[in-house]
From Swiss-Prot:
SS bonds (residue pairs): C30-C36, C353-C382, C432-C454
Domain of life, source organism: Eukaryota
GO cellular component terms, semicolon-separated: Golgi apparatus; membrane raft; phagocytic vesicle membrane; plasma membrane; receptor complex
Domain remarks: Ester-bound lipid substrates are bound through a crevice formed between the LRR 11 and LRR 12.
Residues of the TIR domain: 639-782
Record keywords, A-Z: Cytoplasmic vesicle, Disulfide bond, Glycoprotein, Immunity, Inflammatory response, Innate immunity, Isopeptide bond, Leucine-rich repeat, Membrane, NAD, Receptor, Repeat, Signal, Transmembrane, Transmembrane helix, Ubl conjugation
Site (Interaction with bacterial lipopeptide): F349
Protein name: Toll-like receptor 2
Assembly and interaction partners: Interacts with LY96, TLR1 and TLR6 (via extracellular domain). TLR2 seems to exist in heterodimers with either TLR1 or TLR6 before stimulation by the ligand. The heterodimers form bigger oligomers in response to their corresponding ligands as well as further heterotypic associations with other receptors such as CD14 and/or CD36. Binds MYD88 (via TIR domain). Interacts with TICAM1. Interacts with CNPY3. Interacts with ATG16L1. Interacts with PPP1R11. Interacts with TICAM2. Interacts with TIRAP.
Annotated organism of origin: Boselaphus tragocamelus (Nilgai)
Residue spans, topological domain Extracellular: 21-587
Amino acid sequence: MPRALWPAWVWAIIILSMEGASDKASSLSCDPTGVCDGRSRSLNSIPSGLTAGVKSLDLSNNEITYVGNRDLQRCVNLKTLRLGANEIHTVEEDSFFHLRNLEYLDLSYNRLSNLSSSWFRSLYVLKFLNLLGNLYKTLGETSLFSHLPDLRTLKVGNSNSFTEIHEKDFTGLTFLEELEISAQNLQIYVPKSLKSIQNISHLILHLKQPVLLVDILVDIVSSLDCLELRDTNLHTFHFSEASISEMSTSVKKLIFRNVQFTDESFVEVVKLFNYVSGIVEVEFDDCTHDGIGDFRALSLDRIRHLGNVETLTIRKLHIPQFFLFQDLSSIYPLTGKVKRVTIENSKVFLVPCLLSQHLKSLEYLDLSENLMSEETLKNSACKDAWPFLQTLVLRQNRLKSLEKTGELLLTLKNLNNLDISKNNFLSMPETCQWPGKMKQLNLSSTKIRSLTQCLPQTLEILDVSNNNLDSFSLILPQLKELYISRNKLKTLPDASFLPVLSVMGISKNIINTFSKEQLDSFQQLKTLEAGGNNFICSCDFLSFTQGQQALGRVLVDWPDDYRCDSPSHVRGQRLQDARLSLSECHRAAVVSAACCALFLFLLLTGVLCHRFHGLWYMKIMWAWLQAKRKPRKAPRRDICYDAFVSYSERDSYWVENLMVQELEHFNPPFKLCLHKRDFIPGKWIIDNIIDSIEKSHKTIFVLSENFVKSEWCKYELDFSHFRLFDENNDAVILILLEPIDKKAIPQRFCKLRKIMNTKTYLEWPLDETQQEGFWLNLRAAIRS
């Protein structure tokens, strides 16, 4: 390789290594508490750089194949490690040696073909271990869990290759809360293999065939609380009385999940109930009965009862030969001690009257998600049926008439709790009949639009959630709990109708607000759920909700579910956090203050205008604007006068008898414009002044004390003032008729005062010998 290429190769290797390190670093997202998430990142190894700060590490659903001794050695504070759903086939002996604080370890669904006890020898505080779904055939040659004294949950086995359970496998385990064994292909079970475990709260067995089931039961029946059998075909199951009859049993509950029965194997299971006397609860979930219910030929009549079974639960029972199934009359006598029955989502459309009458101890019956209607309910709730029944659940069946349903249940004298939710009642009649002891009624999701006096007055708990109600105005004097969420209510119900109400759920309606007075009116209210409404966050409402510290103890969903819908600028904010401006909360005060401020402003403006002649400035501005709309200077042909004379009426004698005589009778004569004779009648005075000044070659101001005091003289002087300084000409002639103090001229005529200070003006002489010279100078000024 040429020497010149070596630097390029070195840089490429460095860059690739940096990118690899960057990818590793970015493969995990860790929060400040040390919880790191690396799920589904396509990782093929455990990320490097893990430190003692990591307390929880989730690397499930990746492509990791190998766990080395050094991969986790710095994670000394790790408590949770999830490595499930990877491709791990090798775990080195000391991979978990430094994880002495580990409490949760998941190695499920990998490719481990061998298990080693050395993996767990330092995990003294481990509580949860999942080894399901790997490839091992056995649990190893030595005791795998002997170093795990605190282990409480253990999951082992797989669905294919796990075939053997030996006596040593569970040595060292004395108490387990949950043990799950997946052994669909189990071929060898050495007796007493599970007997070493002194107590198991819940055992889950995945067995495909029941061949070894009885052997396992013999070992655990005295140490087990709950047995759950999954994915098992019990077609060939046969129960041997001799194997269990003389042993003390502790099993209290049996669960069959996804299990297949025949008529024969069902009878064998019923026998088991009799001999395992501690069983009080039996559950069938998603099971299949491959039979027609013909138990008479199977000696079922020899069995007098179901042992001590009090609770029977059946969910999603499949009967392929449903239309050939018999009436089950042979099992009626076995049901006398049963107190609680749940048959859910199993296509039940009828409980025969005779069976109902045999259920003499029944207190709770749940027939949810079935096909019960009023016609079949009439037969089921016949006379003497379910004499001690207290709770009946008929949720999501085919009931349509509320009136008829209540009437059919009158035979149930002890019924106090009825759930008929998710039926299509649509409406509620005005009156109904109900059992006399009714205290709880669930009518949620029944599409009713209004409530009537049909409801029993004895109710203590009522649920009418998720309907189309827009009001609640019923008087229920004994009602303690009301659930009316997901309706269309605009306000809280009237407290006088519900005097003893202590719990109310009214969330997700269209309530805009509620007040302290409303809440206080419910004198016994302890719990209110009102979140999810469209609250208008007014100042009063926010002040109430934010100022009541005790409100959080009443509102169970406070504060997260209480959010503003309006005003728009606080929409989505929690009531606790929303803030409104001062103007929104104290509008009257703000308007009053604004009015006062406006009044003071106008008053101050008036004073300032009076003091600094503001009105005059406005008038002169208007006159100036009017003048600006006309040509700046009239064409020469429009000049009609030699001079416009502005004077005070009190100086008219001097103007008319002296000035006019001297100028208009001179040869050649001057043509003067005087307001008395030349203003156009009917025309605005201000327009006359403007036109006269513009049509005059000069403007003569006869100044005197009277002139300064004259309002119209001021207007004439005002416009001339603008003309003088806007057109920048010398069209103004000042005649001082009598001596006046320059200070008497208003300050606003600053330009005029400046002219008087800088230019010569004509002063009328009192000496007659000098008057001829005055007229001579005036005529010369006009001609200039």
